[in-house]
A protein has these predicted regions:
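Single-stranded nucleic acid-binding surfaces, predominantly the OB-fold ssDNA-binding core
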Residues: 1-98
Length: 98
């Protein structure tokens, strides 16, 4: 699934141990606007994909590719987007030659 949306806040970087190895993770939230409505998308990227998010800033337009995964915690179901690949979409500046 491909989604283009804006970054709500600065990404959060952390790590955890799995099978005796440290796994890097970045979590971030995107907002996709639909007419008068909004959808917030909780995203997570792991391993070497973490590096890409270090240049992201609040408000950036981000393209993500991956899949949604439901997770249960404290009796609630959370929907997270697992990122397979992603990048910042650069804004095109109109340059007028004089």
């Amino acid at each position: 699934m491909n989604i283009n949306a804006n970054l709500v806040a600065e990404p959060i970087f952390s790590s955890f141990e799995k099978d005796g190895e440290t796994v890097e993770v970045v979590n971030f939230v995107l907002v996709k606007k639909y007419g008068k409505g909004k959808e917030y998308i909780n995203c997570a990227a792991y391993g070497e994909k973490v590096e890409t998010a270090k240049d992201f800033e609040e408000g950036d337009l981000i393209h993500i590719f991956g899949y949604f995964k439901d997770r249960e915690k404290d009796g609630k179901t959370y929907k997270n987007f697992i990122v397979k690949s992603y990048n910042k979409i650069e804004k095109k500046e109109n340059k007028e030659e004089e």
